[in-house]
Amino acid sequence: MMNKKNNKYKSDSLDSKEDKVDLYQDAMISNLISVNNKSTSDSDAKKPTENRIELLKNAYKGGTLKPMIDFDDHNTETFMDKRITKNLLDARSLFLSMGVKLIYIKSGTTGHTFKAISRSNKNVVFAVKVCAYPKDDYGGIKSSSRPENVEIRMLKILSYFVVNRLTPHLVLPIGTFHTDIEKFINIPEGVIDLKDEKNDMYKKFIERYHDGEFEKFVSVLISEWCNGGDLLDYIRKNYDSMTLETWTVVIFQLLFTLALIHEKFPAFRHNDMKANNILVEKTDNKHEGPDKWYRYSLGSHVFIIPGIGIQIKIWDFDFASIDGIVENKKVNADWTKKINISKKKNMYYDMHYFFNTLISKRFFPQFYEGGVPQEIVDFVHRIVPEEFRNGSDNINKKGRILVDVEYTTPFKVIMTDPLFEKYRYNQYYFHPQRNMAPKKSILFQQGNGSKQPVPKKSTGQKPTKKV
């Protein structure tokens, strides 16, 4: 069972816009006092994550879909269970029983993405990812090390961090099943416009099917829907209005979550951590505002991060692995080894690939053309020195580092880089009844922290008296 330590994530509201460096820490300490006094705001504390979980629970009602996660069991063992049950279901009947209609979004080389919208409540939306099994590539369709199944296992394992309110920055799965591939070959006319060039991938999928490249069944994954698209698309559309604070918070959300995962699973590698494999959720104005802040805790370290109206969620784990826990036949293939996609522990790899692809001209050409604040350019150069940037002999054409070096880690970056300096605070805070830190904190704590008495700022030393 995992030792949770003090890794927690929650939020609060500030009443003024004074100097943020001082005010963030005061608000944090004040909020912790209110939590341990069991303030009346506790009833609202869980709303953002509780709402996510409640939405997912409701997806099972009235249908035949089996839940992937037991949201009421927070133990590590529950999420580590290797068993993934994929019943053979009729997709049309299932979605009818769930009361949703499917809207086609896009296709990839081996599958499709749909948006499932509730017929009774248009605000209830899910994502449906359909993956075909290429024949003879990675073994039988029930193999746990096939990339299609690895992705599902990884989503289940990593959902531990969301359910236990350690980070919100991961997509939660709902359920998975097998269905006949022909359900997605003979999609009704009008659902997909085959004359539209953006749907060429779907036509290639059909061609591959008729060439006999796919197995008879497809894997269907139902998960949370993120309303902001992928991060790369979001940046391309909004970079001209993204402030230094916005960039800093987005980067922090990613690096904090990687550091958190590495703490429990040091050998975790996403292996395809680029901006278009990260999704964006535009947050509800009721829970987000200019004076909203979030407290992130990692061990004995605390960060106070302002709300920016969006939250990223890491996604797309078909290249991922955790050596000794989640084996991936795609990662072990000869072609991936040649480009340094590996299961070997390296906490720098994913972070490097994210930034080195982001700054490339094929991804975001505006990066070096005034599209980001200079502070962000300087930050990326500190994380990705010239010898590990595009154009170096150490990098392949698609931005992957070819040498096995752990130049730095996400944890080291959030702890030492000046970009995050004003957001870093000591974890040691004062318990109102006992001279010790409380063992539990609450995700998304709501309230006006400044209304509580604010003790002197912590210097990191053990207090000599109760407050």
From Swiss-Prot:
Keywords: ATP-binding, Kinase, Nucleotide-binding, Serine/threonine-protein kinase, Transferase, Virion. ATP binds at residues 105-113, 129. GO terms for molecular function: ATP binding; protein serine kinase activity; protein serine/threonine kinase activity. GO terms for cellular component: virion component. SUPFAM superfamilies: Protein kinase-like (PK-like). It comes from Acanthamoeba polyphaga mimivirus. It comes from the Viruses. Transmembrane segments: none annotated. Residues 443-467 are annotated as: Disordered. Residues 99-467 form the Protein kinase domain. Pfam families: PK_Tyr_Ser-Thr (PF07714). Its EC number is 2.7.11.1. The active site is at 272 (proton acceptor). The keyword Transcription does not apply. GO terms for biological process: regulation of autophagy. It is found in: Virion. This is Putative serine/threonine-protein kinase R400. Residues 458-467 have a biased composition (Polar residues).
